[in-house]
């Protein structure tokens, strides 16, 4: 699924985007943001972040710099290593 989404975004970037020109109000552009979000967070969460970004990309939003949030590791108690002596 991840590679399919990346392929679709790459197709858009190389085949469609040059025809319509730069229109994104953000840096990085929405397609680059979504591509990076999928690479960092996976298809489900990255796709969600990309969709939220696309919904904010409209003439009434000021835009600006909006990086992909860093991945936060969520470790449950069962995966934590026990400290020696405890």
From Swiss-Prot:
Subcellular location(s) of the protein: Cell inner membrane
Key words, A-Z: Cell inner membrane, Cell membrane, Membrane
Record keyword Isomerase present: no
Pfam families: YidD (PF01809)
One term under GO cellular component: plasma membrane
InterPro entries for this protein: Membr_insert_effic_factor_YidD (IPR002696)
Protein topology in the membrane: Peripheral membrane protein
Keyword Isomerase: no
Superkingdom of the source species: Bacteria
Location (main, coarse): membrane
Stored PANTHER family: MEMBRANE PROTEIN INSERTION EFFICIENCY FACTOR-RELATED (PTHR33383:SF1)
Entry function: Could be involved in insertion of integral membrane proteins into the membrane.
Entries under HAMAP family matching the protein: UPF0161_YidD (MF_00386)
Family indicated by similarity: Belongs to the UPF0161 family.
Name of the featured protein: Putative membrane protein insertion efficiency factor
Originating organism: Pseudomonas aeruginosa (strain ATCC 15692 / DSM 22644 / CIP 104116 / JCM 14847 / LMG 12228 / 1C / PRS 101 / PAO1)
Source species taxonomy: Bacteria, Pseudomonadati, Pseudomonadota, Gammaproteobacteria, Pseudomonadales
């Amino acid at each position: 699924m991840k590679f399919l989404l990346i392929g679709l975004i790459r197709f858009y970037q190389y085949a469609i985007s040059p025809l319509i020109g730069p229109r994104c109000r953000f840096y990085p552009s929405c397609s680059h943001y979504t591509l990076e979000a999928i690479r960092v967070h996976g298809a489900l969460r990255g796709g969600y972040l990309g969709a939220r970004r696309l919904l904010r990309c409209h003439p009434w939003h000021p835009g600006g710099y909006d990086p992909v949030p860093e991945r936060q590791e969520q470790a449950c108690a069962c995966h934590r290593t026990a400290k020696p002596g405890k």
